[in-house]
Amino acid sequence: MNIPVLGGVQVNASGNLSVSDIFYPVNGSLVTLFDKNVSAAEALGNLRSKNMLGVDTRINIVGFGAFRKDHKTFWSFDLNVRMEAEANMPYSLFDFLKNGRNEAVINDIKASTQAYLEAAFSYSFPLTDQIYLGARGKFLVGAARARTSIDRLDIKLQENSWNIDADGSFEMSGLEMSSMQRPDGSEYYSFDDFDVLPNKGPAGYGFAVDLGVTYDVIPDLQLSFAVNDLGFISWGKKYLERGQMTKSQSFTGVEIIDGEVHDPEFDFGELEFDRVQASKGKTEMLRTSINLGAEYEVWRHKIGLGLLYNVRVWDVKTFHNLTASVNFHPIPWFTLTTSYSFLNGQGHALGVAINACPSWINFFLATDMLICSHTPQFLPVTSTSMNVTLGIGVPIGRRSHRIPGEYLYR
């Protein structure tokens, strides 16, 4: 049985941006790359054509499970809060803002976030002496979501105004966003001045499954395969706000002195999205992940050598990670793991994990940022990935018989 809230907390952040790419130390304090004390060459030097960042969080509210009489078949139920966010910001956007250019062509700006409740029932059982199967069915209740996509943004500074030719949209579910009204009566959304209020009741429903299998090739070698979050959420049109930006816009207010432009800062908050009445809801797939692993046991099953290949499917890109690990389990109720990960061919991370499960408690903690440099807020400075998982549970009853004793400690 899991301790409420502390039974399982998981926070993952990944992409190709690090804190050191966004913040720079200047005179004893941190400033953003847009600060005037950070040169354009330094600020833009570490950026890529597509700069991506994603975060997902899972918090276990309730969790419990039990083995059946054979002590090999296991069922469980858990209730989780899930939150996800991701963004893609092209290099041309940073170049335009940092260098203060008078014109720019910017494509493919994307940002999205969603929050939902997950009620899951899991069941795992031995199919044969060598094959063990597991499945989890998950009923999803959508709380809120927001998505902004600007496919094309052509910006040009004219004599005393910014001229914009853009193609973009935004959607919001489960949240009520205030709209503005033009003199002709048409409504529009502007991020420069708006209020957002939560709607009462669920904004959508969905279903997903997790599937997994392990295969004991020989007593010392186990292969594993799993697919997680294979499913969708259908967001109803009742709580759906939608805006569209498909026409040219012009913003005045540029200061001109003696024929020269001064302080021509562009305010993205002034972009206007025409309000569009939603004719139907929106169905979106979840972020699916795939894991393929292998572990080989040595020294009477007290040390395991592992290899894990992970694929995560995002809206903007699919990420591939490879992790090698060494697992030490000198006694039945304690495991210490060290790992080294290759992150999408662009970085690396060293991880540590501990699992202690004596008769009265089950505690686990895993992270890949213990030894890397980090901010006072415990954010990694140079790494493009951050993963933290922890949980506390209370064991009740006898241990599992899934791993035969003659293989564990001969």
Predicted stretch roles:
Residues 1-410:
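Subset of outer-membrane beta-barrel
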